[in-house]
């Protein structure tokens, strides 16, 4: 199985102070980093939040993203024009809905810590299964 990481998954990967940091790393070991993908939308979100919330400079955020990308399996280079489902009727849900569309269009699962995204393409990142 191959996964598109959402913004919070990328943040959990990089930032040790994320409440999901340990869970993400355990999950990533289980599924294999070669199966983890990014896209322009999630990478831009990672840069924005790393700078705005974490306090990284642009150079620090860019370097952190470049380091993460060395350990991923791929990058979704083409993204469809948004065709959002009805459940994305609130502005706060548009990015999540778009990422489900990108994942589906590229035959990926959307990996997230957000249990509120109710879509069949979503894979909730949880504790590693033994």
Spans of features found by a protein language model:
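Structured helix-beta-strand junction loops
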Residues: 31-34, 71-72, 105-106, 120
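Active-site regions of enzymes building and remodeling cell-envelope glycoconjugates
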Residues: 120-130
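Short, conserved alpha-helical segments within structured domains
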Residues: 38-43, 95
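Alpha-helix capping/helix-boundary segments
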Residues: 9, 42, 98, 116-117
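Short, well-structured N-terminal submotif of metal-dependent ribonuclease cores
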Residues: 1-38, 53-63, 129-130
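Active-site neighborhoods of divalent-metal-dependent phosphate/nucleic-acid chemistry enzymes
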Residues: 70-115
